[in-house]
Amino acid sequence: MENNFIDYRSFVGMNPEKFYKATLAQSERLMLGLNCLESGQEQKVHDHSGQDKFYFVLEGEGLFTVGDEVKVAGIGMLVWAPATIPHGVKNQTAQRLVILMGIAPAP
């Protein structure tokens, strides 16, 4: 049986080598994940040819790139990256950055 009520805090983790990822929920149509970036870690700019993606900041703040735009987003902010648009994020603060990430259709 699937868990339809998920507390993201039980999935928060860290990896000293690269940013930490955990899958919260997945179907054929959507994947929701948690990305945790320690100070100095980044998800390099990349794109998805047939998938839209969003980031929602749960904790901390990050420097997000979407296309030609580069902006800081903090708690409660949504960052939208349509298919084919290059996107990425870097944690330039001393605090952990925790992001809810969604991608559709699921990989």
List where the protein language model places each region:
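A generic "binding-loop/recognition-motif" signal
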Residues: 30, 50, 69, 85, ...
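Short acidic-glycine-tyrosine-enriched beta hairpin
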Residues: 69-83
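Conserved short histidine dyad/triad with adjacent acidic residue
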Residues: 18, 33-48
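Well-ordered beta-strand scaffold positions
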Residues: 30, 35, 61, 69-71
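Ligand-binding loop in jelly-roll beta-barrel domains
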Residues: 83-107
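Histidine-centered metal-chelating micro-motifs
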Residues: 42-44, 63, 79, 83-89
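Short, conserved beta-strand element in jelly-roll/cupin
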Residues: 36-37, 49-64
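A short, N-terminal "cap"/entry segment at the start of jelly-roll beta-barrel domains
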Residues: 1-30, 44
